Amino acid sequence: MNETINREDLYLFQTGKARQAYLTFGCHYQKKTKTHRFTVWAPNAKSVSVVGDFNFWNPLAHPMKGDKDGIYTIEIEGLKKGDLYKYHVEGYDGICRYKSDPFAFYAECRPDTASKVWDFDDFKWSDKRFINQRKKRQTLDQPMSIYELHLGTWRMPQEEEREFYNYREIADMLIPYLGEMGYTHVELMPITEYPYDLSWGYQVTGYYGVTSRYGTPEDFNYMINELHKAGISVILDWVPAHFPRDEHGLAMFDGTHIYDHEDPRKGSQPDWGTLLFNYGKPEVQSFLISSAMFFADVYHIDGIRIDAVSAMLYLDFGKQEGEYVPNEDGTNINYEAVDFLRNLNEALRTTHEGFLTIAEESTAYPKVTSDVDDPEGLGFVYKWNMGYMHDTLYYMELDPLYRKDNHGAIIFSMDYAYSENYILPYSHDEVVHGKGSMINKMYGAYDEKFASLRTLYGFTMAHPGKKLLFMGGEFAQFVEWRDKEQLDWFLIDQYEMHDSFHKYVAKLNEIYKSEPALYELDQDPAGFEWCLQRDADHSVVAFIRKNKKGRGRKQQQILCVCNFTPMEWDKYKVPLPKKSKLTKILDSSELDFGGDGDVSESKVSTKRVKVCLLYTSPSPRDTERSR
């Protein structure tokens, strides 16, 4: 960390150009003077001091010196790792507040809120080769199957005196599981420090600290390092849209709205009861961009998924008429947020080659994944395809009798599949708040639900776009995700259908990763060809996926056939490539997957909803196949 503060570092912070503000601000050990230096931005404060265990929380003991720009600093002797501290801020409004350090690397576990003096030990990373290969491994033509995870409830200790597993314990259980299931990436719901469990981490008070619920920064280092050693990339949920009003956090930090807006029509998010960042302030941009960079620089994270991008882009998001202020041209676009997102993506992607930035953006805002070289591009690598998720779940919830009248829901996604670089998400948001679990969303009785979910997952795995599934969905947990209880792992051990479904998802991942036709041309229309698109009466679709052509490399083609009804169609015609010799790769009706066993090497036959994947070869022609 920086031994001294120089004017250039402060200039970068004040102009929105800082990318490593964490080296200047916060608490840092100074080897030369054997002191700890504290630095904080509080431009409108009347006074700031450091208080903690070491001075009996006395605001008069260690007053900080402020400059003309409101940057306060002090060096204190005799501190040790783990000492508790806060800033005592006498605000512009005359109110004295005890504030956590916005740049703290570690903090007390809730409900306590003090920051901790924390000097990073020399953790011995062993993932250099993995990091060096990131650019090649995370290109658009590589497979990506993401397991979305909430660390606190994936597995929980059975001992009453323990609330959570440690980062290290989680790593030792999670890594073999991800390997067994064939996932390429894991996405962690927010682990930046937060006070309220039921926010799931989406109301952040510590943008530079991993939550102490699961251990120390060194424990988190261990988890990331071990995941990398196992070949698994790590994506973090990161929340730069809004922050909570908690007294110890960023709100009214110096008695004024330095991180948000003074006008509540600009600075308040009524749906969530939170405050919106003011991206027009260069210091706020420096603070947030440096936070994302910190996790890439220090913790070796491979990507971030940015939550609630729509709430950033639209001034009227979640608001009624009169509750927001239009921009200067009278529209609802937040141009300051657009500027911030472009700066963020450019900083991360140029500094860390192959780094993933993923937008959870629920509207049709254009060019989310266009490069920042495009004046209108936001610069993300991927965008969640929320439309695909909504349409496919709506379709699968229908009685099969009515699916023919809603056939567009299952095919519409291909009309815009190449407008952005998409991830197809079945995330935590879809299995909470009474929405039902993935298996319970499916129409029908017990066996039909499983047949339908196998079909949906198979269809999704073959559909253009990268993949994401929230924990529990891989073994068809019947209850919704419960944010205070672990997953129902007993289902795999005690119920054959759940065990078989679990194996089916692992098989899908295995096939997906081993077949370039299923991922290489996700962003290229040349990699997809409809065979059957509009047969609404039978609720059948069929399409071919293709890999890249290359010198000395034969193009592979994979046929996907989906029957979305429990009907058996006799001598059903599917247009297939000329002189096709079909070899079945997967049939969701196989007994091993919980199906009825109605399978054949020479036929695609079924009495249930199902999906089949088959090898074929080029040049289309109508060929009669029995169904």
Placement of each model-derived feature along the sequence:
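Glycine-rich phosphate/pyrophosphate-binding loop
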Residues: 109-151, 407-453, 460, 602-603, ...
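C-terminal accessory region downstream of the catalytic core in glycan-modifying enzymes
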Residues: 487, 493, 501-502, 508-510, ...
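Short proline/glycine-enriched turn/loop motifs at strand-loop junctions of beta-rich domains
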Residues: 41-47
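Substrate-binding/active-site clefts of carbohydrate-active enzymes
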Residues: 108, 128-141, 150-332
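Conserved alpha/beta catalytic core and glycan-binding cleft of carbohydrate-active enzymes
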Residues: 300-302, 317-485, 492, 513-516, ...
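Conserved small/polar residues in nucleotide/adenosyl-binding loops
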Residues: 615-622
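The feature marks proteins involved in alpha-glucan
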Residues: 1-37, 65-148, 153-162, 169, ...
